[in-house]
Regions:
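A short beta-strand motif characteristic of beta-propeller blades
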Residues: 25-32, 69-75, 112-119, 154-159, ...
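Bacterial N-terminal signal peptides
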Residues: 6-15
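Conserved beta-strand positions in repeat-built beta-propeller and related beta-rich domains
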Residues: 52-56, 95-101, 139-143, 178-184, ...
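Blade-level signature of beta-propeller repeat domains, shared across WD40, Kelch, NHL, RCC1
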Residues: 257-284
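Beta-rich, blade/repeat-based domains predominating
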Residues: 32-45, 77-89, 121-133, 161-172, ...
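Short loop/turn segments that connect beta-strands within beta-propeller blades
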Residues: 64-68, 107-111, 150-154, 190-194, ...
Length: 284
């Protein structure tokens, strides 16, 4: 079975080079902004702001991506257990409003947000949201154990039988990586939500793997929450790097239950959730 999964992985990722270059994360700084269990995070489309799902404060915190200073926030008057955020092609923000069993939709004007809609059909406890280049919205229902695809506000596809699914990230060729957290694995899905490949606990020692992002060469960066590390996995399935000691700690290259991951160019932002901070790295 393991060999079959490895073969599927390679078939699913042939668009990328088979050997990624060596990665050297260089610690830059940590936030001092008062956050409470921050989860996933996303740069605004123009790169000006870093939007952080601030779970314990029931809001989205907006930080300066360079200094990690707080600029603004929104949602604390109506969100509950905010877990994830993504943007569509025209800059609207979609937020996983987890404890309210919905994804809230906002028009964004600079650092101001206006609630304009929501998605809630067939999902409970959404913790991941992806705005795909095909125009669909993919939502991971952590409590409902499913992934739902919406088009024009209607459900058009669904994958069930999952365990606390979390993040969804689009690959260069339009496939989707999903963290099936309760099953301690990553799944590669087609846009129609068919499973194409699996990276499992046996091969990668995942323990509650959570949020993800992709480097330009297709390398996966994954927050392996309960192992207190960040894992870098090459397109050919090779483990390139484990960042962190594997024990809870605070400081450079130390984490407590890290979750959120965002990459832009050679800059990496991480949500060190158990330490209530955002950490910034340069990838050399």
């Amino acid at each position: 079975m393991a060999n079959r999964l490895c073969t599927l992985l390679l078939i699913g990722l042939v668009a990328f080079p088979l050997h990624a270059k060596e990665i050297k994360p260089v610690y830059m700084l940590s936030s001092s902004t008062p956050l409470d269990n921050p989860h996933d995070l996303k740069l605004s489309p123009n790169g000006r702001y870093l939007f952080v799902a601030d779970v314990g404060n029931n809001r989205v915190a907006i930080l300066d991506p360079d200094s990690l200073a707080m600029i603004a926030s929104f949602g604390s008057d109506h969100q509950s257990g905010t877990h994830d955020i993504d943007f569509d092609a025209v800059g609207r923000a979609y937020v996983a409003d987890t404890h309210n069993n919905r994804v809230t939709i906002y028009d964004i004007d600079d650092s101001k947000a206006r609630l304009v809609g929501e998605l809630n059909e067939r999902i409970r406890g959404p913790e991941g949201v992806l705005l795909h280049s095909n125009g669909r919205v993919y939502v991971a229902g952590a409590w409902s154990g499913n992934v739902v695809a919406y088009q024009d506000g209607r459900v058009v596809a669904e994958l069930t039988g999952l365990s606390s699914p979390h993040d969804l990230e689009e690959t260069a060729d339009g496939d989707i990586w999903l963290s099936d957290s309760g099953n301690h694995r990553l799944l590669l899905l087609s846009p129609q939500l068919r499973i194409k490949a699996e990276l499992g606990r046996r091969q990668y020692n995942f323990n509650g793997v959570r949020y993800l992002d992709l480097l330009d060469d297709g390398t996966l960066v994954a927050g392996d929450k309960n192992n207190h590390v960040i894992k870098f996995i090459a397109p050919d399935g090779k483990m390139l790097l484990v960042l962190g000691s594997g024990k809870p700690g605070k400081g450079a290259n130390q984490f407590v239950t890290p979750e959120g991951v965002e990459v832009r160019g050679n800059i990496l932002w991480l949500s060190d959730s158990g330490n209530d901070r955002i950490v910034k790295y340069r990838l050399d």
